C-alpha cells in the first residue's frame, strides 16, 4: 500500500472558510456524454456519477444547458425546466450518499450549434454573426445571429435561474462554463467578437457579458456556491484571443471582487509534443497567484504531472477528464499506481446508456480487462 501522505494528489484539501472539504484532490472534470434523452437527465447518470464518487471527492457534471437556445449537441442535459430539476434530484442524492460534493456546470453553446437544435429552427445566437470555419470533421455549424443589446439581460437571467434550479435540485454549487469556445468565450475573445457597442472592442467590454453572468449568479445563490471554468489560452471552436494573459488576468480580477468565490477552474494551453512526449505548457501560474481562492488546473494531466503541480503549489486541485471517464476508481488506481483502462473515443458521445459509459471495469473487478483506445 502506498503511503498516501507521500502522494500529493491524495492529500486532503480544506478551503479556508469555504465549503470545499476534500479527502483527495482528484476531481472529475466536466465532460459531455450525450446520454440525457430529450435534455432530461436519466437514471443511468446516477450510476455513472456514483461510480466515480468517493467520500470527500468532488465531481463536476457534464455541461448542462441553461435554456432551449443553449443546445448544440445531441441528448445533453438541461436545468431550465421543472422536469429537469426533478430528474436531477435522485442523481444528486445518489452522489451525496457516497459522500462526495457535486457541482453543476452551467452552459450555453452560443454559435456552436445548428438551426436543428434551436427553437423553431432559428439561428444560434452569439456575440457576432461570425460562423465557425468547418474543420474537416463533417460538422457544419450554422451561421449565428448577433445578440441585440436588449436581448442580453435575458441570457444573463437564464444563467441566474438555472443556478437557482441547480441548488433546488440539491447541487452543492454551480460552475459557470466560460471556456472551450462557448457563448461566454465568444464574447470574451477578440477573434469571435467584432461588436462595436458596450459588449465589444475593449477587454473590459468583451468581458462585460461574462461578468454580468457571474454577478447575477452570485447574487442569486451566493459566491460560496459559484465557480467558473476559463480557458484564455485555448483556440477551440475558432475562439482565440490575441492576448490571453491579459484576458485571464482581467477575469481573475473580477472573480476576486466576490469574497468567498467557490473556485477558479482553468484549462492549460494546448499540450506540446517534445521529443515524442506530451508536455503540459504550465501557463496558469500568474492566474493562480492572482486568484484569492481555490484554484483548479485542467488539461491533459496524469498521475505524475498531477502530483507534481500539487506538490509545488501550482494548483490546489486537479481535474481529470478522459482518465476518470475510463477509470471510475481513478483515485484508488493512483494510490496503488495500478494500470489504467484505456478510453475508447468511439463511445464518448454515443447515446448508449451502458457501453462506454458505465461498463469501464473497476480495479477489483478485472485487472486485465482494458478497453482499447481508438
Swiss-Prot record:
Domain of life: Eukaryota
InterPro entries: Aldolase_TIM, OxRdtase_FMN_N, Oye-like
Active site: 182
One term of GO molecular function: oxidoreductase activity
GO biological process: jasmonic acid biosynthetic process; oxylipin biosynthetic process
Keywords carried by this UniProt record: Fatty acid biosynthesis, Fatty acid metabolism, Flavoprotein, FMN, Lipid biosynthesis, Lipid metabolism, NADP, Oxidoreductase, Oxylipin biosynthesis
EC number: 1.3.1.-
Residues binding FMN: 30-32, 63, 105, 229, 300, 321-322
UniProt KW Oxidoreductase keyword: yes
UniProt key word Cytoplasm: no
Broad EC category: oxidoreductase
Cofactor: FMN
Disulfide bonds: none
Positions with a binding annotation for substrate: 177-180, 270
A Pfam family the protein falls into: Oxidored_FMN
Functional description taken from the UniProt entry: Putative oxophytodienoate reductase that may be involved in the biosynthesis or metabolism of oxylipin signaling molecules.
Protein family per UniProt: Belongs to the NADH:flavin oxidoreductase/NADH oxidase family.
Full protein name: Putative 12-oxophytodienoate reductase 5
Amino acid at each position: 500500500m502506498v503511503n498516501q501522505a507521500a502522494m500529493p494528489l491524495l492529500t486532503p484539501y480544506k478551503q479556508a472558510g469555504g465549503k470545499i472539504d476534500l479527502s483527495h484532490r482528484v476531481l472529475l472534470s466536466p465532460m459531455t456524454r450525450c446520454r440525457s434523452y430529450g435534455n432530461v437527465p436519466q437514471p443511468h447518470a446516477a450510476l455513472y456519477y456514483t461510480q466515480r464518487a468517493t467520500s470527500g471527492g468532488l465531481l463536476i457534471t457534464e455541461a448542462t444547458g441553461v435554456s432551449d437556445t443553449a443546445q448544440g449537441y445531441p441528448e445533453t442535459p438541461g436545468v431550465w425546466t421543472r422536469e429537469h430539476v426533478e430528474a436531477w434530484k435522485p442523481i444528486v442524492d445518489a452522489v451525496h450518499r457516497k459522500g462526495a460534493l457535486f457541482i453543476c456546470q452551467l452552459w450555453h453553446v452560443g454559435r456552436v450549434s445548428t438551426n436543428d437544435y434551436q427553437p423553431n429552427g432559428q439561428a444560434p445566437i452569439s456575440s457576432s454573426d461570425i460562423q465557425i470555419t468547418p474543420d474537416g470533421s463533417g460538422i457544419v455549424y450554422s451561421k449565428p445571429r448577433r445578440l441585440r443589446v436588449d436581448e442580453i439581460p435575458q441570457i444573463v437571467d437564464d444563467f441566474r435561474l438555472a443556478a437557482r434550479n441547480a441548488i433546488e435540485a440539491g447541487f452543492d454549487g454551480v460552475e459557470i462554463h466560460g471556456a472551450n469556445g462557448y457563448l461566454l468565450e465568444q464574447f470574451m475573445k477578440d477573434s469571435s467578437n467584432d461588436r462595436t457597442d458596450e459588449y465589444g472592442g475593449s477587454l473590459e467590454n468583451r468581458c462585460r457579458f461574462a461578468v454580468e453572468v457571474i454577478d447575477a449568479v452570485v447574487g442569486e445563490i451566493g459566491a460560496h456556491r459559484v465557480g467558473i471554468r476559463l480557458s484564455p489560452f485555448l483556440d477551440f471552436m475558432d475562439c482565440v484571443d490575441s492576448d490571453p494573459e491579459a484576458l485571464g488576468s482581467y477575469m481573475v480580477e473580477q472573480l476576486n471582487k466576490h469574497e468567498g468565490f467557490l473556485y477558479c477552474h482553468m484549462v492549460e494551453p494546448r499540450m506540446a509534443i517534445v521529443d515524442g512526449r506530451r508536455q503540459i505548457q504550465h501557463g496558469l501560474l500568474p492566474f493562480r497567484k492572482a486568484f484569492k481562492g481555490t484554484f483548479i488546473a485542467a488539461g491533459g494531466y496524469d498521475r505524475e504531472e498531477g502530483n507534481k503541480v500539487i506538490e509545488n503549489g501550482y494548483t490546489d486541485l486537479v481535474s481529470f477528464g478522459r482518465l476518470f471517464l475510463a477509470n471510475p476508481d481513478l483515485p484508488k488506481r493512483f494510490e496503488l499506481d495500478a494500470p489504467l483502462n484505456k478510453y475508447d473515443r468511439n463511445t464518448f458521445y454515443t447515446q448508449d446508456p451502458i457501453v462506454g459509459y458505465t461498463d469501464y471495469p473497476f480495479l477489483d473487478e478485472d485487472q486485465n480487462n482494458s478497453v482499447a483506445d481508438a
